[in-house]
């Protein structure tokens, strides 16, 4: 009797695994967005349940099927909508959203924004995105990221001089949903990465900074967002604040993607400009290594933080002991599909209209190299 029970259980598990396995044959090798206006693509996400793709174009979110046909869109965001990820626990789409008045943030959109700076995670009810040109108030709530705002507004001392923005923080951009660091299952956490200003003269901006939040009880913070009156409803602190030493990059992690297949986190960046660093385009953060409480380099005063390790794959710069990849894509969108497959954004401009667009290409990553899937 017990033997029969276990045989049936094994058959059931195998059937479920087979149903959930990635069917690569049905995935298009390319998905084109079509022309989307003056702002370039910032992030992408694949919705396995609804079999569709989401793309952010700075002030617009579009929802397309796998043939690129628009199923719905959210218009009129006057902030900077960036990297995004789908939360498998609640089926909603989470994205970074910035309102600030620096060279990038000032003047996005056509409406006058609140004079304050604000950094948020935008949360979209994707099942309600059913038609083009929807207003964000119909489908989106937001949670304030106080830690990023505090670091953005802070003044610190570096090399004896007062400088703006702790850690070089320019806000938030990269975002991923993944289990607690080092685990492959369990409750989903939200990870959002700082944008980091590209200042070659500072020594305290050579880390990527990643905030980790338990989002299971975020409902109490969620509010609609008025760009003329930015709210500050959000957690006081992150559950953890992680540091990854990569060398300074231009505006920090642009896209962050969790690869469930390997357990690693991929961080796509615009390369930095410090001559003493290798300035890679892509870093892989090792999900098998536990965080370590370490002394942080480059600070005027002794500073400790939870540090994460880079995966020892790709190219290695012996001088700085930095691992990374010279993969030119991913900074405008990368999402894991499973089994080592990814959709990766190749941004461009439409030849006829001159408007911004992107084509998502299907890639296979073997841990060392990226290959287009034919």
Regions found by a protein language model. Give the residues of each.
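Residue-level detector of Asp-centered blade-edge/turn motifs that repeat once per structural unit
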Residues: 46-49, 86-90, 179-186, 260-262, ...
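Beta-propeller blade signature
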Residues: 108-131, 203-222, 226, 278-301, ...
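Beta-strand-rich domains and repeat architectures in extracellular enzymes and scaffolds
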Residues: 29-59, 173, 179-180
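Surface-exposed loop and turn segments in beta-propeller and other repeat-based domains
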Residues: 27-34, 127-172, 215-250, 293-328
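Blade-loop segments of beta-propeller domains
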Residues: 67-111
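Beta-propeller domains
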Residues: 23, 46-77, 235, 290-299
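Residue-level signature of beta-propeller blades and closely related beta-rich strand-turn architectures
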Residues: 59, 98-101, 127, 149, ...
């Amino acid at each position: 009797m017990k033997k029969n029970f276990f045989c049936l259980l094994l058959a059931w598990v195998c059937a479920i695994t087979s149903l959930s396995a990635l069917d690569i044959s049905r995935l298009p090798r390319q998905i084109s967005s079509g022309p989307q206006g003056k702002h370039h693509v910032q992030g992408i996400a694949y919705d396995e349940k609804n079999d569709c793709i989401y793309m952010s174009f700075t002030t617009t979110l579009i929802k397309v099927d796998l043939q690129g046909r628009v199923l719905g869109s959210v218009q009129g965001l006057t902030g900077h909508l960036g990297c995004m990820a789908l939360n498998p626990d609640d089926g909603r789409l989470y994205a970074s959203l910035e309102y600030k008045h620096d060279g990038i943030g000032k003047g996005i959109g056509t409406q006058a924004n609140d004079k304050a700076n604000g950094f948020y995670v935008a949360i979209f009810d994707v099942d309600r995105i059913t038609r083009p040109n929807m207003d964000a108030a119909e489908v989106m709530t937001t949670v304030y990221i106080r830690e990023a705002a505090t670091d953005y507004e802070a003044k610190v001392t570096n090399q004896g001089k007062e400088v703006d923005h702790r850690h070089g923080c320019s806000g938030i951009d990269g975002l991923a949903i993944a289990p607690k660091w080092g685990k492959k299952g369990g409750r989903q956490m939200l990870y959002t990465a700082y944008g980091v200003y590209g200042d070659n003269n500072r020594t305290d901006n050579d880390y990527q900074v990643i905030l980790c939040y338990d989002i299971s009880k975020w409902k109490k913070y969620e509010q609609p967002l008025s760009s003329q009156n930015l709210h500050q409803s959000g957690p006081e602190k992150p559950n953890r604040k992680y540091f990854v030493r990569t060398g300074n990059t231009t505006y920090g992690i642009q896209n962050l993607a969790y690869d469930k297949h390997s357990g690693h986190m991929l961080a796509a960046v615009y390369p930095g400009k410090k001559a003493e660093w290798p300035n890679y385009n892509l870093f892989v953060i090792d999900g098998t290594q536990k965080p370590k409480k370490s002394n942080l380099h480059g600070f005027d005063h002794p500073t400790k933080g939870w540090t994460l390790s880079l995966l020892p794959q790709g190219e290695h710069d012996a001088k700085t002991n930095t691992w990374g990849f010279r993969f030119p894509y991913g900074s405008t969108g990368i999402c894991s599909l499973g089994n080592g497959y990814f959709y990766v954004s190749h941004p461009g401009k439409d030849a006829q209209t001159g408007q911004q667009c992107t084509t998502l290409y299907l890639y296979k990553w073997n841990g060392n190299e990226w290959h287009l899937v034919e």
